[in-house]
């Protein structure tokens, strides 16, 4: 377990707000009480983990006590004040050396929907680790992580979509503008094609994709920004493609939600 200030820093007790935990998920449930019981009796002799694929309303109010180590959050006695803490050394070892990725990189392999989603989860973990390393100034290790991600979860078997716009930024921050531009263009291809498809539907049908429209607009903004900063020769061409969709129904719906989210965040 990662100890922020050494073994002497382990607190004597954890203070968990049951009120906040109950409010977040509409009440306390038996599984929450079971988690608290395990924490009370476990005395940190055995580690306790929570899967990254769980919704945060399943964390029993322990969000600020979780540290990401790979595909799971480890429950710790430390209150970090926010969710999203990463043990970069342990996570690096898990993603780069311990985890096995099967035949995902084999060209022509069939990827069913469930397997594809799991691969996307793994890719997201690579991205979170690379982002953490970039922020700590460890660009060489960040590049290693991004290259490993590209090697074991290539886009020819798990295509880039609106979830991968940050990947372009990460390549750019790590110093590889060529790969950043390649990823950004793949993401923008997906985003614009999906919007074009949505625009072929009725407004009522488009409205059912409101959340997706928001994610795509967010993705377009980030990927377009990354592409423009790389100095790629096709950057203006992609910018023009995005501009041509600005006044279409799906883009406008996504922009409305995006602007609302930005206002709420202020």
Could you tell me what each predicted segment is?
Residues 1-266:
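ER/secretory pathway lumenal C-terminal domains and tails of membrane proteins involved
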């Amino acid at each position: 377990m990662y100890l922020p200030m050494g073994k002497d820093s382990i607190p004597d007790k954890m203070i968990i707000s049951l009120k906040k935990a109950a409010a977040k998920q509409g009440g306390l449930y038996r599984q929450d009480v079971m988690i608290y019981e395990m924490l009370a009796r476990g005395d940190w002799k055995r580690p306790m983990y929570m899967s990254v694929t769980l919704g945060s309303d399943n964390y029993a109010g322990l969000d600020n006590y979780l540290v990401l180590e790979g595909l799971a959050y480890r429950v710790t006695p430390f209150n970090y004040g926010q969710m999203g803490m990463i043990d970069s050394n342990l996570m690096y070892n898990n993603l780069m050396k311990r985890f096995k990725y099967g035949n995902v990189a084999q060209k022509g392999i069939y990827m069913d929907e469930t397997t594809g989603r799991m691969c996307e989860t793994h890719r997201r973990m690579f991205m979170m680790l690379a982002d953490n390393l970039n922020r700590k100034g460890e660009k060489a290790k960040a590049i290693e992580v991004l290259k490993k991600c590209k090697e074991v979860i290539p886009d020819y078997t798990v295509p880039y979509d609106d979830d991968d716009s940050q990947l372009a930024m990460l390549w750019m921050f790590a110093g590889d503008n060529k790969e950043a531009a390649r990823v950004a263009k793949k993401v923008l291809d997906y985003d614009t094609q999906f919007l074009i498809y949505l625009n072929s539907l009725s407004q009522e049908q488009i409205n059912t994709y409101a959340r997706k429209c928001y994610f795509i607009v967010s993705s377009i903004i980030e990927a377009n920004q990354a592409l423009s900063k790389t100095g790629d020769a096709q950057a203006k061409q992609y910018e023009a493609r995005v501009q041509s969709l600005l006044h279409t129904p799906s883009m406008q719906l996504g922009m409305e939600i995006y602007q609302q989210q930005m206002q709420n965040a202020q």
